[in-house]
Protein backbone atom coordinates (compact mmCIF):
# COMPACT_ATOMS: atom_id res chain seq x y z
CA UNK A 1 0.00 0.00 0.00
CA UNK A 2 1.39 3.38 -1.02
CA UNK A 3 1.21 5.89 1.84
CA UNK A 4 0.96 9.63 1.36
CA UNK A 5 1.59 12.29 3.99
CA UNK A 6 -2.01 12.16 5.27
CA UNK A 7 -1.84 8.39 5.75
CA UNK A 8 1.47 8.73 7.61
CA UNK A 9 0.05 11.48 9.82
CA UNK A 10 -3.02 9.36 10.56
CA UNK A 11 -0.81 6.43 11.55
CA UNK A 12 1.40 8.58 13.77
CA UNK A 13 -1.55 10.16 15.57
CA UNK A 14 -3.40 6.86 16.04
CA UNK A 15 -0.28 5.20 17.45
CA UNK A 16 -0.10 7.94 20.08
CA UNK A 17 -3.86 7.98 20.79
CA UNK A 18 -5.96 5.14 19.40
CA UNK A 19 -9.08 6.54 21.07
CA UNK A 20 -9.00 9.92 19.35
CA UNK A 21 -12.29 10.86 17.69
CA UNK A 22 -12.43 11.01 13.92
CA UNK A 23 -13.28 14.72 14.14
CA UNK A 24 -10.21 15.49 16.23
CA UNK A 25 -8.01 13.30 14.03
CA UNK A 26 -9.27 15.09 10.93
CA UNK A 27 -8.63 18.48 12.53
CA UNK A 28 -5.09 17.48 13.52
CA UNK A 29 -4.05 16.32 10.07
CA UNK A 30 -5.92 18.95 8.08
CA UNK A 31 -8.63 16.89 6.38
CA UNK A 32 -12.39 16.97 6.65
CA UNK A 33 -13.93 14.12 8.68
CA UNK A 34 -15.33 12.04 5.79
CA UNK A 35 -12.09 11.59 3.82
CA UNK A 36 -10.22 11.09 7.09
CA UNK A 37 -12.55 8.26 8.10
CA UNK A 38 -12.28 6.70 4.62
CA UNK A 39 -8.50 6.70 4.95
CA UNK A 40 -8.61 5.14 8.42
CA UNK A 41 -10.98 2.41 7.17
CA UNK A 42 -8.70 1.76 4.17
CA UNK A 43 -5.67 1.46 6.48
CA UNK A 44 -7.61 -0.98 8.66
CA UNK A 45 -8.84 -3.00 5.68
CA UNK A 46 -5.32 -3.25 4.25
CA UNK A 47 -4.10 -4.70 7.54
CA UNK A 48 -1.64 -1.88 8.13
CA UNK A 49 -3.69 -1.03 11.22
CA UNK A 50 -4.08 -4.46 12.74
CA UNK A 51 -5.95 -3.50 15.90
CA UNK A 52 -6.36 -1.17 18.85
CA UNK A 53 -5.28 -2.03 22.38
CA UNK A 54 -5.27 -0.60 25.88
CA UNK A 55 -1.82 -0.33 27.45
CA UNK A 56 -1.98 -1.46 31.07
CA UNK A 57 0.20 -0.47 34.01
CA UNK A 58 1.98 -3.69 35.03
CA UNK A 59 2.88 -2.41 38.50
CA UNK A 60 -0.75 -1.68 39.33
CA UNK A 61 -1.52 -5.28 38.38
CA UNK A 62 1.22 -6.48 40.74
CA UNK A 63 3.49 -7.57 37.89
CA UNK A 64 6.84 -6.21 39.02
CA UNK A 65 9.45 -8.64 37.67
CA UNK A 66 10.35 -8.63 33.99
CA UNK A 67 12.91 -11.02 32.53
CA UNK A 68 14.54 -11.58 29.17
CA UNK A 69 14.91 -15.31 28.75
CA UNK A 70 17.16 -16.97 26.18
CA UNK A 71 16.03 -20.46 25.24
CA UNK A 72 18.22 -23.06 23.54
CA UNK A 73 16.62 -25.98 21.73
CA UNK A 74 18.05 -29.50 21.57
CA UNK A 75 17.29 -29.97 17.86
CA UNK A 76 16.77 -27.48 15.08
CA UNK A 77 13.86 -29.04 13.24
CA UNK A 78 10.73 -27.32 11.98
CA UNK A 79 8.57 -29.65 14.09
CA UNK A 80 10.52 -28.92 17.27
CA UNK A 81 10.33 -25.17 16.70
CA UNK A 82 6.62 -25.29 15.80
CA UNK A 83 5.81 -27.23 18.98
CA UNK A 84 7.81 -24.79 21.13
CA UNK A 85 6.16 -21.77 19.51
CA UNK A 86 2.68 -23.20 19.97
CA UNK A 87 3.28 -24.05 23.63
CA UNK A 88 5.01 -20.77 24.50
CA UNK A 89 2.16 -18.77 22.91
CA UNK A 90 -0.20 -20.36 25.46
CA UNK A 91 1.60 -18.74 28.41
CA UNK A 92 0.06 -15.37 29.34
CA UNK A 93 3.25 -14.31 31.13
CA UNK A 94 5.13 -14.34 27.81
CA UNK A 95 4.83 -10.87 26.29
CA UNK A 96 7.12 -11.51 23.36
CA UNK A 97 8.83 -14.49 21.75
CA UNK A 98 11.50 -13.91 19.12
CA UNK A 99 13.39 -16.49 17.06
CA UNK A 100 16.91 -15.08 17.14
CA UNK A 101 20.40 -15.53 15.78
CA UNK A 102 23.78 -14.30 16.98
CA UNK A 103 23.39 -15.56 20.55
CA UNK A 104 23.96 -18.93 22.15
CA UNK A 105 20.20 -19.34 22.06
CA UNK A 106 17.39 -19.93 19.62
CA UNK A 107 14.65 -17.81 21.20
CA UNK A 108 14.40 -14.71 23.33
CA UNK A 109 11.34 -14.32 25.51
CA UNK A 110 10.17 -11.25 27.37
CA UNK A 111 8.17 -12.38 30.38
CA UNK A 112 6.49 -10.53 33.22
CA UNK A 113 5.46 -11.99 36.56
CA UNK A 114 4.61 -10.95 40.11
CA UNK A 115 7.92 -11.85 41.76
CA UNK A 116 10.86 -14.27 41.77
CA UNK A 117 8.73 -17.12 43.14
CA UNK A 118 6.32 -16.71 40.24
CA UNK A 119 9.24 -16.60 37.80
CA UNK A 120 10.73 -19.77 39.27
CA UNK A 121 7.39 -21.53 38.94
CA UNK A 122 6.94 -20.37 35.34
CA UNK A 123 10.44 -21.46 34.42
CA UNK A 124 10.60 -24.81 36.20
CA UNK A 125 7.00 -25.97 35.85
CA UNK A 126 6.13 -24.71 32.40
CA UNK A 127 8.91 -23.39 30.16
CA UNK A 128 11.54 -26.06 30.81
CA UNK A 129 8.91 -28.78 30.45
CA UNK A 130 8.30 -27.93 26.81
CA UNK A 131 9.79 -30.68 24.63
CA UNK A 132 13.10 -29.65 23.14
CA UNK A 133 14.12 -26.96 25.61
CA UNK A 134 17.73 -27.77 26.45
CA UNK A 135 18.97 -24.58 28.06
CA UNK A 136 17.74 -21.37 29.63
CA UNK A 137 19.56 -18.15 30.50
CA UNK A 138 17.69 -15.35 32.24
CA UNK A 139 18.46 -11.65 32.59
CA UNK A 140 16.31 -9.45 34.77
CA UNK A 141 15.18 -5.97 33.79
CA UNK A 142 16.22 -3.34 36.29
CA UNK A 143 14.54 -0.41 34.53
CA UNK A 144 12.81 0.26 31.23
CA UNK A 145 14.76 2.97 29.44
CA UNK A 146 12.70 3.02 26.23
CA UNK A 147 9.25 1.46 26.19
CA UNK A 148 7.62 2.40 22.92
CA UNK A 149 5.14 0.50 20.79
CA UNK A 150 4.94 3.12 18.03
CA UNK A 151 6.61 2.37 14.70
CA UNK A 152 8.37 5.15 12.78
CA UNK A 153 6.00 6.23 10.00
CA UNK A 154 7.16 9.72 9.07
Task: Please describe what each predicted stretch is.
Residues 1-154:
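A compositional/biophysical signature of low hydrophobicity enriched in polar/charged and small residues
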Amino acid sequence: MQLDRYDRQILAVLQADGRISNQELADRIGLSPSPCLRRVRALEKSGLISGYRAILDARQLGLTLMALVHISMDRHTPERFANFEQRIAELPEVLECLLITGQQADYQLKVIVKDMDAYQSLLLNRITRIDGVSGVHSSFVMRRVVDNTALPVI
